[in-house]
Amino acid sequence: MNIVILAAGTGKRMRSALPKVLHPLAGRPLLAHVIDTARTLKPTHLVVVIGHGAEAVRKAVAAPDVQFAVQEQQLGTGHAVQQALPLLDPSAPTLVLYGDVPLTRAGTLQALTDRAGQGGYGVLTVTLADPSGYGRIVRDAHGKVARIVEQKDATPEQLAIAEINTGIIVAPTERLGDWLAALKNDNAQGEFYLTDAVEMAIEAGLEVVTTQPDHEWETLGVNSKQQLAELERIHQRNVADALLVAGVTLADPARLDVRGTLECGRDVSIDVNCVFEGRVTLADNVTVGPNCVIRNANIGAGTRVDAFTHIEGAEVGANVVLGPYARLRPGASLHDESHVGNFVEVKNAVLGHGSKANHLTYIGDADIGARVNIGAGTITCNYDGANKFRTIIEDDVFVGSDTQLVAPVRVKRGATIAAGTTVWKDVEADALVLNDKTQTSRTGYVRPTKKKS
C-alpha cells in the first residue's frame, strides 16, 4: 500500500510564520503524529506532499522511509496528490491522509482499507450534528455514494445532509492517476478537488464504499490556534484515560500533560500540573508531587518526587527522595536511597547509595560515593571558564556546609570537610580538612544609623 500525506497548506488562520503542520501537539509536530500512524500500516511507499515552508517541513520529519513531493502552487487536494503519483507503486492502492489531522487511529484506517480492498474506492465519513464547513456525502436512492459536494458548492438541500467527507480516501493508484488528470477547477474555490474523483470512479463502474471512525475527534483538523488547543486537550484526555485504565492514580486527569511516552508500573501516583516529555519511565510505587517536569528520565521503584522538581536526562534509583524544588540535569545518576533536597542542582554527576544533598547545593561533573553527606551551600567548582573538571568524593565522606570543592580534586574515603572550607587539594582518607580562620570580636560596637531627613 502507498500512503500520501498532504502537508503543503499555508495555514493562514494560524497567524504564524511556522508551517501549520509543524505546530506542536503533545510536544511533537502535527505531521509527526500522522506519519507515526501511517507507519503502523506498513506502507511500501510513504510520501509527504510539501509546499509552504517546504524545507522546514522536510527537515522536521526527514527519515529513511519518508519521501517528499513538492507542490509549488497550492491548487487543491487533487493537484497535491498528483505531485506524489510518480513516487508511488501503481499496482498498490493509495491511502490519502492529512498532515493537520493528527488523531486518526490506525485501526480506523485499517478498517477503511480492508473495506475498499485492493481495487476499491473507500471514503472515511462522519455524521455530525453540525456539519457546517464540510463537504457533504450525497447518496442515491439506493443509499450508495453518488458524489461529494463541497460546502461552498452545495445546494440548500445538500447542506442539510449530516454525513460529511473527512477527506481521507483510499483508491487504486493507477486509476486514481487517470481521474486526477481529468479534474477541472470550475468551482467556487478555483481548485482541483480530490473529492471530484469520486464521481469519476462511480462513472467507471466502481462502488464507492464508506466507513466511519469510532470517535468524531479522530477526524478533527487544525486550522486555528483554538482548534489546536482543543485537539491538545482531547489527546491529553485520551492519554490520561489510558493511564487510569492501567492503574495509575491521577489527582486530576485534566491537569496532566504527556508530551511523549510515559510508562508506569503498579501503584504510581501523579499529582496535578505535571508535565512528562520525551520517554519517561516511572517504576512501581513512584509518587510524583504537583507541578513537576520530567523529561527523558527513568525513575526507580518507591521514589518520591516532591513538588516543583525538574528532571531531565537523569537516571534515578529506587527509594530516592527528590525535592521539593530540586533540579536534575542531563547525566545525573542517583543511586538507591539517595536524597536530593530543595534548591539542589545535579548535573552530569553520580550520587551514590544513601548519599544526601538536602539543601542549597550545586553538584556538577562529580562522582560521589555511598553514604556521603553534602552540607547546605556546597558547590563543586567545575569550570575554569574554558574547561570542565571532575570532583571525586569517595564513600562515607562528610562535607560541611558552605564548602567549595575546586576541581579537579579527590576527597578520599571517610574524610571530613569542616564548614566553610575551600578544598583545592586532594584530601586523604579519614582526614579532617578545614581552612584556618581567625574570628575577631569587638566589644562596644555601635551599628551605623541612617540620618533622619
Swiss-Prot record:
The record's GO CC annotations read: cytoplasm; membrane
Annotated compartments: Cytoplasm
Which annotated residues bind UDP-N-acetyl-alpha-D-glucosamine? 6-9, 20, 71, 76-77, 98-100, 135, 150, 165, 223, 329, 347, 362, 373
Biological process (GO) annotations held by this record are: cell morphogenesis; cell wall organization; lipid A biosynthetic process; peptidoglycan biosynthetic process; regulation of cell shape; UDP-N-acetylglucosamine biosynthetic process
Kindly give the Pfam families that the UniProt entry links to this protein.
Hexapep_2 (PF14602), NTP_transf_3 (PF12804)
Q: Name one GO molecular function term.
A: magnesium ion binding
Q: Which cofactor does it need?
A: Mg(2+)
Residues at which Mg(2+) binds:
D100, N223
Q: What name does the UniProt record give this protein? A: Bifunctional protein GlmU
Q: Which gene encodes it?
A: glmU
